Regions:
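Structured soluble/peripheral alpha/beta segments that form catalytic or ligand/cofactor-binding pockets
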Residues: 1-362
Length: 362
């Protein structure tokens, strides 16, 4: 499959081509605040997740400006989601006033109400993040210790002609996670593996982007983070592709030059969208990953989160159809290093966010 490439879309790779011959080191300010909080069409958020022993998965957001379409667009907020081993979920979005928000522009330090995120850095360049989020139903108090140093594709930015920019940095491609959580009135000591990234942009998602798919793969020896972002006709359906590969703590691959194949779409009545049961990511001669969906963890028609009037306008006037999937897949990873091929397997979760119908509706 040949990529659509618009020469007016500028990606921040150091080269040659759409990859990093030199991987730029992350600095503390890369994970600090970038936008003018409250300004129109400026969005920024810090994302954390963790897969915990015992079968729990959690997700936490700190929003300087909430990016999703709806009445909360642009609001300061935090979000807590807990997926339990039995498949049940609690998800809370709590909004705050600007007077309750602080974020440094020099280092990773965010306070929203009583919710906090702060990082420290060791002499060897590995970071430690402490996060705390709480409402009446959920509480997360966690420490993330980096196992792979922070990474960004090129300088982290993609510029979409004169339409705006999108920035993505990954301060914690892979981290050990310890701490405790509260689920209702039940306290749990937890440990597991986690991830943290950070995004900011100056346009509304749906104005340029049709869909994106992203995730991570953690095997015994390798860590991979990827994103495939399909843009619309405004930029000639340009596809932004980013991928990081690390062996142990060493990042050996930072590239947008990979083949991305989606197959065997299945329609979800709940989400009103289809998702691919199989995804293959291939960097010829270097890395290949096959994802086969074993379970749908979340499937959401995002119009269900709108009030009825706004949902009608979004669907029938703006022609928006936002949907979301969190998928659990079995993976096979093949890595070639120094002419030696290694094969490792496991399971992982990955996500799909879309504003158009994917695949064929059956």
């Amino acid at each position: 499959m040949t990529d659509n490439v618009n020469p007016n879309v500028k990606e921040g790779w150091t080269g040659p081509g759409r990859r990093d011959g030199t991987i730029l080191p992350m600095k503390p300010e890369d994970d600090a605040l970038h936008i003018d909080v409250g300004a129109k069409n400026q969005f920024e958020w810090w994302y954390f997740d963790a897969t915990l022993e015992g079968g729990y998965t959690l997700v936490a957001f700190f929003y300087a400006a909430y990016p999703n379409p709806g009445l909360d667009t642009g609001k300061i907020a935090v979000e807590l989601t807990l997926l339990r081993p039995d498949g049940t979920k609690t998800q809370k979005v709590i909004k705050y006033k600007k007077s309750q928000f602080f974020a440094s522009k020099e280092e990773p330090h965010v306070t929203i109400g009583s919710n906090t995120m702060k990082a420290t850095f060791t002499e060897d360049g590995f970071s430690i993040y402490e996060i705390f989020l709480e409402d009446e139903d959920l509480m997360f108090e966690l420490t993330y210790k980096a196992q792979v140093k922070g990474w960004m594709p090129g300088d982290g930015y993609s510029y979409f002609a004169n339409l705006g920019y999108f920035a993505w940095v990954v301060p914690l491609p892979r981290a050990s996670v310890t701490g405790h959580i509260r689920d209702g009135d039940k306290m749990l000591d937890v440990s597991g593996v986690g991830y943290h990234d950070h995004n900011w942009l100056d346009f509304s998602f749906q104005s340029i982007i049709e869909y994106w798919m992203w995730g991570r793969v953690y095997s015994e020896n390798y860590s991979v983070a990827y994103a495939f972002i399909q843009c619309n006709e405004k930029v000639d359906r340009h596809a932004v592709k980013v991928l990081m590969g690390a062996k142990g703590s060493e990042i050996f691959l930072s590239s947008g030059e990979y083949e991305f194949t989606q197959e065997d779409f299945v329609y979800s009545e709940v989400a009103g969208h289809s998702y691919p049961q199989s995804i293959t990511i291939n960097v010829p001669g270097e890395l290949e990953i096959k994802l086969d969906v074993a379970k749908v963890l979340e499937q959401v028609n995002m119009l269900d989160n709108f009030n009825p009037v706004l949902a009608f306008l979004a669907k029938n006037v703006l022609r928006l159809k936002p949907g979301y999937f969190r998928l659990k897949s079995d993976f096979t990873l093949k890595a070639t290093r120094d002419q030696l091929e290694t094969v490792e397997t496991g399971s992982t979760s990955h996500e799909v966010v879309t504003f158009k119908q994917l695949g064929a509706r059956e």
